[in-house]
Amino acid sequence: MLKFEILATDTSSHARRGTLTLNHGVVQTPIFMPVGTYGTVKGVMPRSLREMGAQIILGNTFHLWMRPGLDVMQSFGGLHGFEQWDKPILTDSGGFQVWSLGSMRKITEEGVHFASPVNGDKLFMSPEVSMQIQTTLNSDIVMQLDECTPYETNGHKTTEAEARKSMEMSRRWAVRSKNEFERLGNPNALFGIVQGGMYKNLRQESLEALVEMDFPGYAVGGVSVGEPKDEMLDIMAHTPHRLPAHKPRYLMGVGTPEDLVEGVAQGVDMFDCVMPTRNARNGTLFTRYGDLKIRNARHKTDHQPLDPSCTCHACAGTEGVSWNDGGRGGFSRAYLHHLDRCGEMLGPMLTTIHNLHYYLNLMREVREALDAGQFGAFRARFKAERARGV
């Protein structure tokens, strides 16, 4: 089941505000979706995710197929029961992970033959297998199996002919994914994925073919795969707003806070990215006034929280009152610097909570600006504040 309703639009851009109703709940859009690769958002309890405003999270079809396997998933009635998350879940198709195996896999028209990275077993992923796995996972949003078109391979930039061949295979796999999804009687929603590399004419062909197939929602894939930022932004400016206005649009694997706000302006409703969680574990924190490197020596004696305007548990403690509003319940930069230096596990747990809170709160502010008809002013203020630096 999927119902998408647009509540407001921005007159100066393609931005829109909506609600997405799925089998496990209603999602307010635009939305950022935390990534839970192995059935968990690394280091974060489900309760904490709910408290910080997460409405929908991702699961990784490929990795959950490898471990713990479909028998275990089936015994729990799907991924929701297994990871104790009662809100919507989106699962990717497994295509990107199989593509990432490089020399360990062989792609044919039928599907992908590859060696398991867990135990070396010979395995096969096809559009039909992907649909069967995702049906067992019972995710609210299922993604078609696609071939992720690389930007370059061993220093060789993908040509238009190579990108076309890849895009056309993804298009044929979309047909097979949809047929199998319907044969299985899956009650959830299947999204098609627009491919075509960095070639706008191929993106347009892919888009038109998928729209003809009438998917409940659409994703833009094959971006943030090693291409220069300006080329990624070029595709972002071209493709999302050309998708059907009455259906949700999902930009896969993107990106920085600036990318998210720009994506909203280009008509994107849904985002996911490992950046907030991965960067948190590597000591890079997102704040209203730019990125903060907690490993820098200057933070050794700094009494401030990561972001004085932030109300996350790391910055504001259990009271949830920011430093700017008089609260003093959070942890100092000095303490988080110390935890990182010592390799204490609490460090990345707190920084992950902060980064996810920042992303989710950013999307909340975007929604509020759209509700108020002030997205243009918000966008300008956001850019100025982020450029100021911490």
UniProtKB/Swiss-Prot annotation:
Keyword Metal-binding tagged: yes
Cofactor remark: Binds 1 zinc ion per subunit.
EC number, as in UniProt: 2.4.2.29
GO biological process terms on file: queuosine biosynthetic process; tRNA wobble guanine modification; tRNA-guanine transglycosylation
Binding of Zn(2+), residues: 310, 312, 315, 354
InterPro entries per the UniProt record, alphabetical: ArchSynthase1/Queuine_TRR (IPR050076), TGT (IPR004803), TGT-like_sf (IPR036511), tRNA_ribo_trans-like (IPR002616)
Names of required cofactors: Zn(2+)
Active site, UniProt feature: 92, 272
CC annotations in GO: cytosol
Record-listed substrate binding positions: 92-96, 146, 195, 222
Chain spans, region RNA binding: 253-259, 277-281
Pathway(s) served: tRNA modification; tRNA-queuosine biosynthesis
Entry-linked NCBIfam families: Q_tRNA_tgt (TIGR00430), tgt_general (TIGR00449)
Family: Belongs to the queuine tRNA-ribosyltransferase family.
Summary of subunit composition and partner proteins: Homodimer. Within each dimer, one monomer is responsible for RNA recognition and catalysis, while the other monomer binds to the replacement base PreQ1.
Protein name per its UniProtKB record: Queuine tRNA-ribosyltransferase
